[in-house]
Amino acid sequence: MGALGRALLWLQLCALARAAYKLWVPTTDFEAAANWSQNRTPCAGAVVQFPADKAVSVVVRASHGFSDMLLPRDGEFVLASGAGFGAADAGRDPDCGAGAPALFLDPDRFSWHDPRLWRSGDAARGLFSVDAERVPCRHDDVVFPPDASFRVGLGPGARPARVRSVQVLGQTFTRDEDLAAFLASRAGRLRFHGPGALRVGPGACADPSGCVCGDAEVQPWICAALLQPLGGRCPPAACPDALRPEGQCCDLCGAIVSLTHGPTFDIERYRARLLRAFLPQYPGLQAAVSKVRRRPGPHTEVQVVLAETGPQPGGAGRLARALLADVAEHGEALGVLSATARESGAPVGDGSAAGPLGSGSRAGLAGGVAAGLLLLLLALAAGLLLLRRAPRLRWTKRERLVATPVEAPLGFSNPVFDVAGSVGPVPRTPQPPPAQQAGSSSTSRSYFVNPLFAEAEA
């Protein structure tokens, strides 16, 4: 096979592999200002202190002179050509001052699960990754800086970190046995620590529609590391009804388009189409395209996250509708069977293509409106019924009150028959209430007192 044939074979293998690269960013280099308490490299004549109980590997690229230096108990200094340490009097550098000693910060502060410490090797302008996919996925190639020192914490150890390959100190590990032997060596112990484990395999993603990242089980650790500077809490979103895509730690403003695809769908081709034909028309938007698991159930779908980063909101919703229209027109050619979309603050409209588009949002809205109208009609019917019965009740009560007259007493007081010796008028006998008079049949309503019969009886 000639050189051209070998080149074509290599290109075909790369196309089939579809491996992504994740690059480790922070270092423990001596000249890195971020590694020092004063956020600068120690000046000449300063007092330098390394953590006594920490193991660390430090690359030194220049010559330095200090008045005093406290070294770690377990560590190494990798000196570049012409680099070294020497003694220098305190105050030799007038800009240094006689302040506190320069402290080398804790080298164990860097965690494998911190998304801020990784950079994607194939990132394009306008594209981003959800938080869980910023950490190496199981099909990624991991590259550590070959000419810099570093130290990585592998986590609590409940779940091993699994990637396709690890490149460190000029070596590429694709087998667990070789990687385990390196991690057990002194060079490995100085660069990797913690109870966690690191594994390689099973290989690159061979599915043109993409592969699930596989970091869902460790997402709580990823979010904890990401939100540690914020006290473990997400900042409030700048929009109502913010969205939280699969793999994201906090809510965001924008839209999410979910694609159900067929066997001919190619995620790289769709990502390139989005980047070339749509994103340039919507400045202030970033997109993330990846395969995720559809909840509930074991099935997968392609998630397109449109995040608004500009000052003018609403662009994500317009782009989501444009993507739905694109699926309605070109869905069969793209290998997309159906698409749905939702937007922060309001549902996104859709059209019909080779499958139901946006049926979830529209059906939910229609169901809510129908339920509200039904409740309103029931309330109106009950109110009308009460209004029609209330006057009849009041009129019936009034008729009952009028139909029961209050009868005046029929008796009278006769002063001729009053008892002798009484002065003044004889008090009237108290009359029983009307209800008792009406209900009594043995008591006469017309009577008077006869004193003659009263004396005879006496």
Swiss-Prot record:
The entry's localization annotation reads: Apical cell membrane; Cell membrane; Endosome membrane; Membrane, Coated pit
**What are the VWFC domain coordinates in residue numbering?**
203-254
Report the main location listed first in the record.
membrane
What the entry lists under PANTHER family is as follows:
AMNIONLESS (PTHR14995), PROTEIN AMNIONLESS (PTHR14995:SF2)
The gene is: AMN
Positions bearing carbohydrate: N35
Q: Name one GO biological process term.
A: receptor-mediated endocytosis
According to UniProt, the name of this protein is Protein amnionless
Q: Sorted alphabetically, which InterPro entries does this protein's record hold?
A: AMN
The record's Gene Ontology cellular component field reads: apical plasma membrane; clathrin-coated pit; endocytic vesicle; endosome membrane; extracellular region
**Interaction with CUBN as annotated region, ranges:** 67-87
Briefly state the protein's biological role.
Membrane-bound component of the endocytic receptor formed by AMN and CUBN. Required for normal CUBN glycosylation and trafficking to the cell surface. The complex formed by AMN and CUBN is required for efficient absorption of vitamin B12. Required for normal CUBN-mediated protein transport in the kidney.
Q: Where are the transmembrane segments?
A: 367-387
Signal sequence: where?
Answer: 1-19
